[in-house]
């Protein structure tokens, strides 16, 4: 129970301290919030990753509805259900699949280097793929007759796809280093996650 509270507190700090987890690029933000999700997914498996993804989705929802994320109010206006699915399902799937990948790879690669790198990078990959899929499903095709909406959503779609490289690189490096270090330290102390 206390580990869960600590994980949520770390994600809250990471989400709401300005400049700590987000690089603002206008309409969309490059988010570094996948890093704690990757770490939790690697340490606590698919269920931990799913719960971390849920927390990430909750904080994304709060930021979207309060205007901290500039795309949130616009997307919510077009489709409240689509907005909820996009922020919750994409992030939960990203956490679950990262934990699953880590567990699968770690069975064959006991040191944890490759498994932590793949799982950390996969959070960005899965989040971006599912985000763009839900985005296209709920928002882009719905407003095909409005020229302004087409331009807005095409720009938002392109910028979201473009920030993927930065998110992937940062998650790969930072997430895997932290996971590998925590695992090694825990092994030396005789602690298992």
Residue ranges, per PLM feature:
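Loop-helix junctions at membrane interfaces
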Residues: 1-193
């Amino acid at each position: 129970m206390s580990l869960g509270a600590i994980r949520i507190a770390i994600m809250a700090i990471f989400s709401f301290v300005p400049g700590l987890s987000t690089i603002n690029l206008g309409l969309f933000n490059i988010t570094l919030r996948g890093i704690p999700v990757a770490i939790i997914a690697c340490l606590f498996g698919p269920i931990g990753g799913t719960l971390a993804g849920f927390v990430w989705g909750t904080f994304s929802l709060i930021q979207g509805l309060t205007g901290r994320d500039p795309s949130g109010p616009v997307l919510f206006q077009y489709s409240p259900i689509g907005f909820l699915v996009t922020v919750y399902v994409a992030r939960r799937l990203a956490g679950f699949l990262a934990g699953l990948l880590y567990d699968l790879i770690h069975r064959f690669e006991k040191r944890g280097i490759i498994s932590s790198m793949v799982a950390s990078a996969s959070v960005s990959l899965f989040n971006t793929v599912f985000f763009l899929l839900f985005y296209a499903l709920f928002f882009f095709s719905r407003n095909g007759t409005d020229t302004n909406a087409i331009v807005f959503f095409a720009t938002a779609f392109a910028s979201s796809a473009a920030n993927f490289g930065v998110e992937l690189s940062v998650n790969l490096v930072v997430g895997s280093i932290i996971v590998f270090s925590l695992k090694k330290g825990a092994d030396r102390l005789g602690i298992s996650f």
